[in-house]
Amino acid sequence: LSSAASDVYKRQDATDPGINLFRFDVEKGTAVPVKSLSGIQDPSYLTVSRDGKFVYSVSETAVPDAKVCAYSFDKQTGTFSLLNEQHTDGSAPCYIWVDSKHRMAVTANYNGGSISVFSISADGALLPAEVYAYEGGRPGAERQAVPHLHCVYASPDENYLYANDLGTDRIYKYEIVASDKGLSLREGTPASFSLPVGEGPRHTVFHPNGKWAYLISELSGRVALMYYDKGNLTPVRFVEADTLHVSGSADIHITPDGRFLYASNRLKGDGIAIFSIDLENGQLTKIGYQLTGIHPRNFVITPNGKFLLCACRDSHIVQVYEIDKQSGLLKDTGKDIRVSKPVCLKFTDM
């Protein structure tokens, strides 16, 4: 097979939470279970190193239990081996990013109002965390009284790191500094970017051309087109993804050819908003809406752009949709992958 899915799921309220590995045929849209890894409490998000040799998963719990687990991954056998664990010292880590050469890992700690920065040793193990805590919020505001960090990600050239704060409507910016000791963060100039009050920034994705970034805001249900230039992100237009205004927008991804963007919504009218992208200026045009199973918290697009896999947490399935290459619309293949409480999906070659 040209690619296999390291489709990973948090089974949040299941009897045996953990990570499931499937071999996914990216031409036929079918999945075969390979291995499962149990015993991780609330593994709500993970990332795979670019070379596919390491997996890093958060355990979205409260301090002092909140942590990151580092695993080596054997592509031949599909075996995970625990390297080590490190505490985040920030409650509810819900997102993790690792640089392309796996020298640094960073988590967004939702209830901790912080990010945790870990250096990674040559064998893939994590060193203790350095915590960056934030302040602010609107007293009395529902879900925005205090900082709630929800996502960390890098610029395409990995010169900058950004942290989305749902609680304060800010995107924090850092320079990623390389030295003989590894990578470190330095406060950017400016240190942050402000968004309209009540946006609630959640996840961000860069366009393949590296010039545009798209932000899905959980509370407003809008997608922001942001122009990227020398480390700065400038919002230029907002479009609605959630027309029901229930403050449950979740995930966002772009097809490999850069022509279509998808954004998921939860809580009511669960589904995925579909947009075409103007390749001249990055502007979005809404072209459709695909209803999904219940609570589509996370989804991925296959590396060849043929399928979209959607983790429907409360339907206990991963739905497999075929992407129409011309229109961008989705067609349910009916080839559901059944798993308890799926919430995070990742691909890696095997």
Q: Where are the regions a protein language model picked out?
A:
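Blade-loop segments of beta-propeller domains
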Residues: 33-98, 102
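Beta-rich, blade/repeat-based domains predominating
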Residues: 15, 40-51, 89-102, 135-158, ...
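Short loop/turn segments immediately following beta-strands, especially the blade-tip
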Residues: 23-29, 71-78, 118-127, 175-184, ...
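A short beta-strand motif characteristic of beta-propeller blades
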Residues: 32-38, 81-86, 130, 136-142, ...
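Loop-centered beta-sheet repeat module
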Residues: 160-218
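Short glycine/acidic-enriched loop and turn motifs that connect beta-strands
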Residues: 11-14, 61-64, 111-114, 168-169, ...
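Single conserved hydrophobic/aromatic residue that forms the stacking wall/gate
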Residues: 1-5, 9
